[in-house]
């Protein structure tokens, strides 16, 4: 059996984390079986579908590196195909034209609800032999089987059964001639030879209707798997109030795609006690049988932990390719200062996101206007003048500018003045970075460079002198 899966988002908004997880599971299942993965844009909702949403979905898929083998297909470009199939069904008697007015259908619904019945179409036009003009407005309905049941073996939830008596004759073509979502999906899955439909649990109620249409077309029925929803950490459905829900918002917030993928794959799937999965491991180990039927809770702290792990374990050069975007957003000129891969090594341990790195690195590349007030008040005092003068001269005298030699200069200053390293290090840190926190002082001063470091120490000495004159 040829394995072929699809991800079929509706372009009415951004690619959210729930959709991204569904895409990931479909992609992994196809890759695990050496199959194919199709991207299909279900844009039949003409009023809500937008080009911006299509672009956002494609951007999200590309950023996550979930490459597709076919597509993207667009349902709006296949209306002729859908309508041809509907016309054939009318001839075959598996679909029929319905001329019931909106007023009649509204009255029927009100009557059924007043009687405590489930609102449903009563099938009046299914058995009608009334003559209607060719140009009289009508919809087309699917003639759903009226007895028996639909049973499908959900690969995550087990067997699910629906009575056909619970399913009315759904509309498959509107009065304006446009086919409806549930019908387009069926024809697409048939034409594209989809073997496995992996989607959210909100589609479970669509499945029996789609299976009945497939059977009416004598088309093969794919295997279905419905993934549970993602909740916030408070147990309620994930929404913007829980934080970012758009995939590209996580990009903007400084997450690596590997971290988000690793986090999403574990939201409902597991392989023993393993937490960290490379893309190759995900492909090798993934199975639908190991996907939980219970809802998952989104935990941002866990995602942050994973992101920090990947920033510090992936090749710095690779991480730097993603950091570049954040540097550009921060409008930092990196032409003078350390390479971005070096910056990843310098700040990766201290920062959990790439955005944090970009926000923390400016002093490596640009001059700062003022010292942090609290840090300067505490460390740029008259008592720091001599340590700064001595360490400045020792740094200026270094011929081979290495982090090791910088360390020796700082240590030699402390030894010469017979003071602790902190008496030299803290004023020096504030002098060269403008603040009271940084990576290791030797690597920081080395990355800033000799000329710039000496100039900043002189600036700090000037600050101390001015402070002394005001006392």
Swiss-Prot record:
Where does it localize? Cytoplasm
Database matches in PROSITE patterns: AA_TRNA_LIGASE_I
Keyword annotations from UniProtKB, A to Z: Aminoacyl-tRNA synthetase, ATP-binding, Cytoplasm, Ligase, Metal-binding, Nucleotide-binding, Protein biosynthesis, Zinc
The protein's required cofactors: Zn(2+)
Which chemical reaction does it catalyze?
tRNA(Glu) + L-glutamate + ATP = L-glutamyl-tRNA(Glu) + AMP + diphosphate
In alphabetical order, the GO MF annotations are: ATP binding; glutamate-tRNA ligase activity; tRNA binding; zinc ion binding
Q: Give GO BP annotations, semicolon-separated.
A: glutamyl-tRNA aminoacylation
Q: What binding partners and quaternary form does the record give?
A: Monomer.
Q: Which HAMAP family match?
A: Glu_tRNA_synth_type1
Kindly provide the name given to this protein in its UniProt entry.
Answer: Glutamate--tRNA ligase
Source lineage = Bacteria, Pseudomonadati, Pseudomonadota, Gammaproteobacteria, Enterobacterales
């Amino acid at each position: 059996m040829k394995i072929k899966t699809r991800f079929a988002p509706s372009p009415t908004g951004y690619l959210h984390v729930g959709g991204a997880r569904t895409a990931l599971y479909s992609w992994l299942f196809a890759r695990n079986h050496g199959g194919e993965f199709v991207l299909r844009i279900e844009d039949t909702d003409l009023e809500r579908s937008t080009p911006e949403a299509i672009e956002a979905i494609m951007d999200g898929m590309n950023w996550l590196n979930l490459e597709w083998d076919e597509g993207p297909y667009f349902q709006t470009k296949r209306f002729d195909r859908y309508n041809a199939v509907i016309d054939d069904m009318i001839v075959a008697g598996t679909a029929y034209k319905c001329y019931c007015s909106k007023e009649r259908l509204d009255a029927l619904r009100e009557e059924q609800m007043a009687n405590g019945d489930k609102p449903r179409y009563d099938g009046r036009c299914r058995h009608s032999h009334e003559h209607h003009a060719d140009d009289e407005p009508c919809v087309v309905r699917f003639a759903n089987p009226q007895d028996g049941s639909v049973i499908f073996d959900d690969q995550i939830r087990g067997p699910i059964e629906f009575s056909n008596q619970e399913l009315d004759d759904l509309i498959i073509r509107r009065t304006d001639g446009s086919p409806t979502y549930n019908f387009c999906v069926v024809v697409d899955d048939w034409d594209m030879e989809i073997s496995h439909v992996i989607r959210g649990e909100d589609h479970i109620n669509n499945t029996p209707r789609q299976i009945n249409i497939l059977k009416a077309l004598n088309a093969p029925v794919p295997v279905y798997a419905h993934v549970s929803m993602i909740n916030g950490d408070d147990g309620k459905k994930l929404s913007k109030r829980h934080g970012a829900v758009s995939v590209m918002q996580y990009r903007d917030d400084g997450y690596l795609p590997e971290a988000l993928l690793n986090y999403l794959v574990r939201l409902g799937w597991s392989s023993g006690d393993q937490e960290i999965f490379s893309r190759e491991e995900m492909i090798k180990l993934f199975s639908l049988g190991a996907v939980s039927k219970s809802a998952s809770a989104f935990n941002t702290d866990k995602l942050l932990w994973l992101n920090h792990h990947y920033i510090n374990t992936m090749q710095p050069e690779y991480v730097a390719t993603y950091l570049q975007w954040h540097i550009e957003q921060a409008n930092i000129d990196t032409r003078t200062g350390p390479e971005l891969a070096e910056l990843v090594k310098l700040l990766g341990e201290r920062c959990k996101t790439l955005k944090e790195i970009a926000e923390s690195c400016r002093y490596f590349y640009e001059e700062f206007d003022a010292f942090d007030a609290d840090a300067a008040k505490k460390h740029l005092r008259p008592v720091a003048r001599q340590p700064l003068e001595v360490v400045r001269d020792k740094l200026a005298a270094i011929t081979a500018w290495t982090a090791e030699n910088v360390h020796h200069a700082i240590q030699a200053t402390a030894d010469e003045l017979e003071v602790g390293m902190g008496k030299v290090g803290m004023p020096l840190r504030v002098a060269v970075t403008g603040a009271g926190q940084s990576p290791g002082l030797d690597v920081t001063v080395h990355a800033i460079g000799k000329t710039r470091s000496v100039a900043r120490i002189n600036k700090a000495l000037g600050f101390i002198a001015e402070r002394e004159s005001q006392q």
